[in-house]
C-alpha cells in the first residue's frame, strides 16, 4: 500500500518554518526539547476551548518566548489580561526561565487545518452526521479562497459495526509539489461507539521564492489598507 509522508515534515525549510526556533549546546538540547514538549502539552490542555491553531517557541538569551496562534484571542487573554498572566507564570515554572507570551489572531479559521479538524471532531461528538460536517467544512474553506481541500474521517462512522474510511475533496491538493503551501492536521472525536479520526489537507496556493518569501509575508502587516487611486481630473 502507498503511504503518505507528513506534508509539513517534507516541506520544512522549503516553504514551512519550524515550530521551535532556537539553537542550543549539545548538553542543553535535550532539556530544551523536553521543555518545549511540556509547554505545548500544558497550553493545549489549558486552552482546549480557545481554538488554538499552533504554538511557536523561541528561546532568546536564557528566556522563553511563546506565541499562541488562536482564533479566539479574548479567551486566551481573559479579563484585563489575568488569564495570560497566569499562563505566563505557569510556562515560566515549567521551562525554568523567564517567559513571555504573545497572542496572534488567526484571521480565517476556516482555512486553518487544525481548527477545521477540531471543528469536525466536535461536531461528530455532538452526533452531527459525518457527511454533513465534512461537506460544510469543505464548502466554507473553498468560499474563503482555498485552492483545494481534502477531508478524511475513519472509524465506526454512524455507529457501524465495521470501521471504514470516507473522504471528500474539492479543488486540487498537490501533495508532491514541494512549493505548494499545504496545511495539514488531525483530530480525534471520542464518541460512544469509539474514536473517529479526522484528517484535513488544505491547499492555499504555491509559494515562489522559498523561505525568503514566507518570512517576508509574515513580516508584512496584515490587512494593510489600500489607497484609492487619484482621479485625473478635467482636461
UniProtKB/Swiss-Prot annotation:
Q: Which domain of life is it from?
A: Bacteria
Tell me which Pfam families the record gives.
KH_2, Ribosomal_S3_C
Q: Which CDD domains match?
A: KH-II_30S_S3
The record's annotation in SUPFAM superfamilies points to: Prokaryotic type KH domain (KH-domain type II) (SSF54814), Ribosomal protein S3 C-terminal domain (SSF54821)
UniProtKB keywords: Ribonucleoprotein, Ribosomal protein, RNA-binding, rRNA-binding
Segments carrying the region annotation (Disordered) are: 215-235
Record's keyword annotation contains Isomerase: no
**The keyword Ribosomal protein appears for this protein:** yes
Which InterPro entries does the entry link to? KH_dom (IPR004087), KH_dom-like_a/b (IPR015946), KH_dom_type_2 (IPR004044), KH_sf_prok-type (IPR009019), Ribosomal_S3_C_sf (IPR036419), Ribosomal_uS3_bac-typ (IPR005704), Ribosomal_uS3_C (IPR001351), Ribosomal_uS3_CS (IPR018280)
| Cross-referenced HAMAP family | Ribosomal_uS3_B
Q: What does this protein do?
A: Binds the lower part of the 30S subunit head. Binds mRNA in the 70S ribosome, positioning it for translation.
The family line of this record is: Belongs to the universal ribosomal protein uS3 family.
Spell out the PANTHER family in the cross-references: 30S/40S RIBOSOMAL PROTEIN S3, SMALL RIBOSOMAL SUBUNIT PROTEIN US3C
Q: What is this protein called?
A: Small ribosomal subunit protein uS3
Species name for this entry?
Haemophilus influenzae (strain ATCC 51907 / DSM 11121 / KW20 / Rd)
Amino acid at each position: 500500500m502507498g503511504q503518505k509522508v507528513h506534508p509539513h515534515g517534507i516541506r520544512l525549510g522549503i516553504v514551512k518554518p519550524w515550530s521551535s526556533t532556537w539553537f542550543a549546546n549539545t548538553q542543553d538540547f535535550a532539556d530544551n526539547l523536553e521543555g518545549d514538549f511540556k509547554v505545548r502539552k500544558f497550553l493545549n490542555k489549558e486552552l482546549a476551548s480557545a481554538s488554538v491553531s499552533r504554538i511557536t517557541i523561541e528561546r532568546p538569551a536564557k528566556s522563553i518566548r511563546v506565541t499562541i496562534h488562536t482564533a479566539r484571542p479574548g479567551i486566551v487573554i481573559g479579563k484585563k489580561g489575568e488569564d495570560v498572566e497566569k499562563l505566563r507564570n505557569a510556562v515560566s515554572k515549567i521551562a525554568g526561565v523567564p517567559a513571555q507570551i504573545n497572542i496572534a489572531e488567526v484571521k480565517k479559521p476556516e482555512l486553518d487545518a487544525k481548527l477545521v479538524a477540531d471543528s469536525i471532531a466536535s461536531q461528530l461528538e455532538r452526533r452531527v452526521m459525518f457527511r454533513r460536517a465534512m461537506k460544510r467544512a469543505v464548502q466554507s474553506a473553498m468560499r474563503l479562497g482555498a485552492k483545494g481541500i481534502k477531508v478524511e474521517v475513519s472509524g465506526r462512522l454512524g455507529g457501524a459495526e465495521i470501521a471504514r474510511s470516507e473522504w471528500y475533496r474539492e479543488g486540487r491538493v498537490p501533495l508532491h509539489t514541494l512549493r505548494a503551501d499545504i496545511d495539514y492536521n488531525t483530530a480525534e472525536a471520542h464518541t460512544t461507539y469509539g474514536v473517529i479520526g479526522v484528517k484535513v489537507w488544505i491547499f492555499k496556493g504555491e509559494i515562489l521564492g522559498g523561505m525568503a518569501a514566507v518570512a517576508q509575508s509574515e513580516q508584512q502587516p496584515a490587512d494593510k489598507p489600500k489607497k484609492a487611486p487619484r482621479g485625473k481630473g478635467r482636461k
